[in-house]
């Protein structure tokens, strides 16, 4: 039976620290590194090895997790790792960077016999503390299999998105939804506020109902975005979603008009909900266009 992989972790910030804390129990051992002594101290006290440099982590790890701020920091860390790591080492970048950055760094690493994975995460610091992150991994299938078990310390969903860069592309698509939804939430707050409602109560309603329905992810079950064929199982279901959505969006827009409040995202949603679901615009949208 093979010995457990030795794991290194570079970057003990808001996300990196709780992820690394979950790895303290990893049987292969954990070596950590951060430029801030106060970030490293709790790990040393908990029994982790501490390296005083990125190269020092490379010398002690078979898999190195990187959770630093941005593309520039990732490039600097990976450059130092690639000069010190033994062939066969896997470098997993958890930072959200440009997919092209991941592709470029993977080529550089491959020239030195190393494998780079882009492995961004979703779930935030609370998810990391609970071991409930989702990790989207781009890279070879063999490298993915090597990291799957240690990643399981801080994630309960680890997916192989495809080749290097695919993990980042999936994260960007996921976060597009996240921040468009945040923007829509601010529009909903403005409508509620203009109508004289308590927007903190609206927030409670949204969090309660999303916990039950699953939020936007509840409709993300098809394996393609093309228009739905007449005999497709999803046709009647998503037409029903469209009809409900168009009715409620239309009512919200009418309320906004009465309050002299512009709701640009709601207008776009009314126009694009049906086509986006693959079922075309419904009667409510067509009526509004023709009125």
What are these regions (language model features)?
Residues 54-115:
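Rossmann-fold NAD(P) dinucleotide-binding segment
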């Amino acid at each position: 039976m093979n010995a457990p992989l030795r794991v290194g972790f570079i970057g003990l910030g808001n996300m990196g620290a709780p992820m690394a804390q979950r790895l303290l129990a990893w049987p292969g051992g954990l070596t950590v590194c951060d430029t801030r002594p106060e970030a490293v101290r709790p790990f040393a006290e908990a029994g982790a090895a501490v390296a005083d440099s990125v190269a020092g982590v490379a010398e002690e790890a078979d898999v190195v997790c990187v959770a630093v701020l941005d593309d520039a920091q990732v490039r600097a860390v990976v450059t130092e790792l690639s000069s010190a790591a033994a062939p066969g080492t896997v470098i997993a970048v958890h930072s959200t960077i440009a997919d092209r950055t991941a592709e470029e760094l993977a080529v550089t690493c491959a020239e030195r016999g190393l494998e780079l994975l882009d492995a961004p995460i979703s779930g935030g610091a609370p998810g990391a503390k609970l071991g409930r992150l989702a990790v989207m991994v781009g890279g070879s299938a063999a490298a993915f299999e090597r990291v799957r078990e240690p990643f399981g310390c801080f994630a309960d969903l680890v997916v192989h998105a495809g080749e290097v860069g695919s993990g980042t592309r999936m994260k960007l698509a996921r976060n597009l939804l996240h921040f468009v939804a945040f923007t829509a939430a601010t529009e909903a707050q403005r409508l509620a506020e203009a109508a004289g409602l308590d927007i903190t109560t609206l927030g409670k309603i949204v969090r309660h109902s999303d916990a039950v329905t699953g939020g936007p992810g509840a409709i993300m079950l098809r394996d393609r975005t093309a228009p739905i064929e007449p005999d497709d199982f999803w046709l009647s279901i998503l037409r029903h979603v469209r009809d409900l959505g168009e009715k409620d969006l239309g009512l919200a827009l009418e309320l906004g008009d009465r309050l002299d409040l512009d709701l640009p995202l709601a207008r776009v949603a009314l126009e694009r909900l049906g086509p986006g679901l693959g079922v075309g615009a419904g009667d409510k949208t067509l009526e509004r266009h023709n009125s």
